[in-house]
């Protein structure tokens, strides 16, 4: 049930070359794998994080990694993490990055030097929150539940994504 929207998106997106994903696995496959490995709540948040990172600056951020990996077809290689939270030492605090994204979605990514990811994350959460508010004010309980769930998912994705962005910042050369 949780991957039904992913299957629907794949049926639509795989028909158009203009919707090819710059990542391997594709964002939709990453989402399905995340849900399978980490459950519906955390897996959906990881998928939301990936969607926020799938922006025009993704390649720029990827090549700054300690060991940027590419799939044999040239796409950016980024597998679902086995362990979500890990100990790390360095200049950027993953805990602080997460707290900053709790205060303001996207701020933790900006702190971790991923400004565009933070901006896309903020815009996504703000858009979903606005749609939730509009659904609520229009007395649409279905819309409120759907958009409220999406807002919560992307908000949690921002918190987890900020943590991981700080870990990655500490692993850069």
Where are these regions (language model features)?
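Hydrophobic alpha-helical membrane segments
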Residues: 1-173
């Amino acid at each position: 049930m949780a991957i039904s929207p992913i299957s629907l998106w794949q049926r639509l997106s795989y028909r158009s070359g203009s919707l090819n994903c710059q990542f391997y696995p594709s964002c939709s496959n990453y989402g399905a794998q995340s849900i399978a490995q980490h459950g519906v709540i955390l897996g959906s948040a990881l998928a939301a994080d990936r969607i926020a990172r799938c922006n025009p600056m993704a390649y720029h951020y990827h090549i700054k990694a300690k060991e940027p990996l590419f799939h044999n077809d040239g796409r950016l290689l980024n597998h679902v993490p086995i362990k979500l939270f890990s100990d790390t030492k360095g200049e950027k605090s993953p805990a602080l990055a997460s707290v900053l994204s709790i205060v303001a979605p996207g701020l933790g990514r900006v702190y971790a030097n991923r400004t565009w990811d933070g901006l896309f994350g903020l815009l996504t959460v703000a858009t979903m929150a606005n749609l939730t508010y509009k659904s609520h004010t229009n007395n649409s309980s279905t819309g409120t539940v759907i958009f409220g769930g999406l807002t919560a998912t992307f908000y949690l994705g921002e918190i987890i994504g900020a943590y991981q962005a700080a870990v990655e910042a500490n692993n850069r050369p």
